[in-house]
Amino acid sequence: MYLGIDIGTSELKALLINTQGEIVASNHATLHVQRPHAHWAEQDPERWWQACGEVIAGLRQQAAQTWSEVRAIGLSGQMHGAVLLDAQGDVLRPCILWNDTRSAPQCEALRVQHPEMMQLSGNMIMPGFTAPKLRWVAENEPEIFRRIDKVLLPKDYLRWRMTGRFVSEPSDAAGTLWLDVAQRDWSDELLAITGLTRAQMPDLVEGSAVSATLQANLASEWGLSASVSVAGGGGDNAASAVGVGAVNPGDAFISLGTSGVIFVVNDRLLADPQSGVHAFCHALPGRWHQMSVMLSAASCLRWLCNLLSVTESQLMDEMAQLSDEQRRHAPVFLPYLSGERTPHNDPDASGSFFNLRHETPRALLGYAVIEGVAFGLADGFAVLGDAKRQIHQCSLTGGGARSTLWAQLIADVLQLPIVTHPASASGALGAARLAWLADGGLESEVCLKPLEQARYQPDAARGSVLQQRLQVFRTLYAQQQQARTLLPD
């Protein structure tokens, strides 16, 4: 039995798989984001640990007969978050999350003062990444910065609580801007740019390797053997790739969760920092990946539903009743509720509706939102360069994958077949598979592609209409950039 734990932004999920790769139990706990100021997004790491305990307790009840057979644990988690510990292991401040954009001024300063940083890291300097967050802390909370003994990523904080060891792995570490991504090791030069050293970083192992074993007291508390190992694991998207079997060059998937991601596997580092496409290590040795990221995806629909006091399923049902003619004249939505990464790297981008009228029903607002997210994915797909020519179909994962309407819309916008899988295909499944690999499992047997739930073929006629609306979408963003120059600071 293998346990996979995934720290998302809105929930912590965990599941158990057996040696046939079947999921035998799953559980989750809700997490919340604190936004004390504009552009800020934070969470308390202690809440992650509490949520982990809650989820483990639930799994023990669900799998009471087999729980003690767990041999290894894998970890997956939201990337880029900065957990700062002092020499006593105390958390110095709330974790600054991946979608926090307060460090935009620090990014600009780093680009001007250290132009070599993008070439060394293989990635554009963006507010979501970890290094600019630490520059912000140094400038705005110097007392805290001076006390930093270790900087951990979210899943690696859980690992430390489980094992007492400070360890990370290359797929997650690549999102810090401190990693030599080609060499899969910390870069002393990149660390020095933000006033840090290798001693403040966790050790690195590959995602499919053993990082440590459970502390004896915790193993006893959880009802597990003290010999249970904890695999290196992976950043959320790299782990999800393992979960959907995207492990060979050209394999690709789209994640439609809080954020929106297009992920393509490479056999070597393919860096193009100016494009805004991320070039990171995969969670498996000897592989890398490219990734375009939009900061707000399914979270846009959640925002609208909260605003309208309607459930997502109810609004989706209403959207499904819209005619093609109604959709053709729907408002156009810019999904930049948290700024945007790929391709714009624009923390000040904002959401907006265009073409609202008195008679616009809420179903058309909902359609505009899911269409706007699909258009954001199209912008990210457009800058993937040569990698996109290798993609013949994409798996679709995340909460948004439950919507047949959204899946078909993405297929029509990208003109690419979209495949969905059972809801179990997730970062938690990938984490469990990485645990299995760390326990001696063979990649050819462990990292299988899950069963297809549905396949969505692109429709050329609908795609033609959507391309016209996509041009409106892109024009609106350009006009928004110009209009923002007229706003007061």
Residue ranges and their predicted role:
Residues Q62-W98, M124-G128, R159-D180, D203-E206, ...:
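Short beta-strand-loop/turn "lid" adjacent to the catalytic site in phosphate-handling enzymes
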